[in-house]
Structure formats: structure tokens, C-alpha cells
Amino acid sequence: MKDMSMSNPTESAAVTDMKMQARGVDVFYGAGASARSADDMAADKSVTHAIKEVDVDIADKTVTAFIGPSGCGKSTFLRVLNRMNDTIDGCRMTGKVTLEGEDIYDPKVDPVQLRAKVGMVFQKPNPFPKSIFDNVAYGPRIHGLARNKADLSDIVEKSLRRAAIWEEVKDRLDAPGTGLSGGQQQRLCIARAVATSPEVLLMDEPCSALDPIATAQVEELIDELRTRFSVVIVTHSMQQAARVSQKTAFFHLGNLVEFDETDKIFTNPSDPRTESYITGRIG
């Protein structure tokens, strides 16, 4: 990993190494969440215990899906992976999260630089009020990834190609990103996220605001992106998780109930709570 201070999608992925690892992660919200032990905060009734002792391995060049009912903690845990919870008042995380063996919560780690390595795509497309070109160029500019204008143009083109939108926008790069359709805006946001060459790409329900055609385009793109990046996707759609991921984690009431190969989760789950969720009996 650089210094942070500065196939068929349903097939099982061969796990050669782990890109990220989380161990004993708890997340607490509330005025009482402070620099106390996890046990102390768990006993405090003024504190919401949102994530409870979660261990997860994120494999290299693999799509990992987080599924579970609304409020189960899957999006909260996703934000742990690039310290987005740092921006929320009264939120406290305990445990350890590493990116290629380095503790991302080490005080020496710059969260802004971390987020260049662990990119994020949000539920609702959120292009900046800038041109298509400047949306994609934003990250490389602030992180100093381009030596000159030609370098920057090359990064923008490659990122738009990786997001499968280059052919649709190559003749209007100066047009506002906000003028694109919803599906195009989401692919623009994906291009913006991959422009800093992240090692992990987090996606928080990236298709929930899209129509079926745009959803299919993004799902196809996710399978292509995993040839270069580790992808972690939160989704309410079990069908989508089954289509795009190789590993699936099922969350319920802040607990990681089961984490396994996607095929096994959906055909032969080990925990009865997982079976109840995927068959529609809970959720």
C-alpha cells in the first residue's frame, strides 16, 4: 500500500491474499460514546451499540456484498472501512482495521489520503457542480497524481473508460456533470472514485436510485472493476448480491451473522437467521 500519510461474477473467487482486515470492530453512537472501553460503552444506555465485535476479511480483486435488513449496521460498517464515520459527531469505533497490514486508524494516517486508497460511491449519484472533466480530475489534482495537463487528461480518459461512460461523454467533457442522466451520473461518480487508483472501492447501495437498465450497466461495470480493485457493495437486493459478488456478509441487529462464499450463503446457509432472511421470513 502506498503511504497513507500522504470472470463470472457468481463464481467463487480464489482468495490469494486479504486486501483489508477488520478485527473486533464495535461502533457506538451517542453523547456517551467516548474514549472508554467497548464494554463500558455497551453498558451505557445513552449509547447505541451499532456494530458488535465484527471480524471481516476483504479479499483482493473480489466483490464482497453486505446484506441485511434496514438498520442492521451494514452501511455503518462500510463507513468504518474508510473512516467516514469520523465525520459523524458522537460516533466511536473500537477494534482494528488494516489495509495491506497497515492500521488505518493509526493517528499518523491522514483520512483524506486514506480515502484516495479506499474510494466510495454513495447511494444517490452526487456529481460535483463542475464539468464532467473536472469531476474526474478533482481527486488526481488534490492528491498530486498528475505531473502535467497531459497526464491529467490521460487519467480522466482512463477513468471514464473504466466506468464505461467514455463513449457517451467524450465529446462534451466541458458539460456539467449534473446534466447527465441518473445512471450516467452514477457512472461518473464511479469514474471519479477510481481516478485516484484506489485499492478498495466501497459502494453503498449504488443502484437504489437507478432504473433497471442503468442498474444492469452498473452491475456489469462492477464485475469489470473487480479485475483491478477489491469491491465492497452494500445492497438491499439479495438478487443483486447473488449476481455480482463472490463473498457475502449477512448483518442482523449489528451482528455479523454469517460471512462466506456467496453461493453457499444463498444455497446452504449455516445460520438459521441467514436462511430466514434470504427466504423472506425476517427483514
Curated annotation (Swiss-Prot):
List the Pfam families hit by this protein, alphabetically.
Answer: ABC_tran
Bilayer topology reads: Peripheral membrane protein
Q: Keyword set for this entry?
A: ATP-binding, Cell inner membrane, Cell membrane, Membrane, Nucleotide-binding, Phosphate transport, Translocase, Transport
Q: Kindly report, in one word, the top-level EC class recorded for this enzyme.
A: translocase
Give residues annotated as binding ATP: G68, P69, S70, G71, C72, G73, K74, S75
Q: Name one GO cellular component term.
A: plasma membrane
InterPro entries xrefs:
AAA+_ATPase, ABC_transporter-like_ATP-bd, ABC_transporter-like_CS, P-loop_NTPase, PstB-like
Q: Name one GO biological process term.
A: phosphate ion transmembrane transport
Subcellular locations according to the entry: Cell inner membrane
An MF annotation (GO) of this entry:
ATP binding
Which NCBIfam families does the entry mention? Answer: 3a0107s01c2
Query: Partners and quaternary state?
Result: The complex is composed of two ATP-binding proteins (PstB), two transmembrane proteins (PstC and PstA) and a solute-binding protein (PstS).
Q: Do you know which PANTHER family this protein is assigned to?
A: ABC TRANSPORTER I FAMILY MEMBER 17
Family the UniProt entry places it in = Belongs to the ABC transporter superfamily. Phosphate importer (TC 3.A.1.7) family.
Report what the protein is called. Phosphate import ATP-binding protein PstB
Which organism is this protein's natural source? Jannaschia sp. (strain CCS1)
Identify the coding gene. Answer: pstB
